[in-house]
Amino acid sequence: LYQHDEAAKRVTDEQASWLTLFAMTKTVSQGTARALGAKFPGATMAAKTGTTNELRDSWFAGMDNNELVSVWVGRDDNQPAGLTGASGALQLFSGYMSQRGVNSLGLKMPEGVSWASFSRASGARVASDCPGSLQVPAKLAGLGEPMSCASPVSNPVNALDQWFGGFFN
């Protein structure tokens, strides 16, 4: 007989977990799960859609403040189901949430994460007043000071590698 252990063990740092969850909320508000956001306006949920090669499988993982739910739609003969994550499994999750009701995620930004500006062209951290910069939450430790708008980036790929490399460290 299995008994759930209530004590959770943290395996990633709080900042990386929060940034991942924040990115997953953007899937609902702006990405492949935006139909879910439209169906539940004002609710904050996180999600990830998935589709395997040749439309064989439709996957969706969604969460609110109460539950994390994973849905798979596919065929047992490995033939294409003909559905994407958004057109298949997301629809089942959406129906489930309609029945159960949504309890919005509470996303309190953790210490060590702050809004920062990045160049869309290079990925380098730039001053917040740079035209065309993208503002996103970031784990600032190790990023260094932002560059001025006029500063050239010597190696744009390295700037992105630094940003992503520090994401989960």
Feature map (PLM): residue ranges:
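Short, low-complexity, Pro/Ser/Thr/Gly-rich segments in the mature regions of secreted, periplasmic
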Residues: P156-N169
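Amphipathic repeat-derived elements
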Residues: K108-G112, P152, N169
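Secreted/processed peptides and extracellular or luminal domains of membrane proteins
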Residues: V136-A138, S154-V157
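A penicillin-recognizing enzyme superfamily signal
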Residues: L1-K139, E145-P146
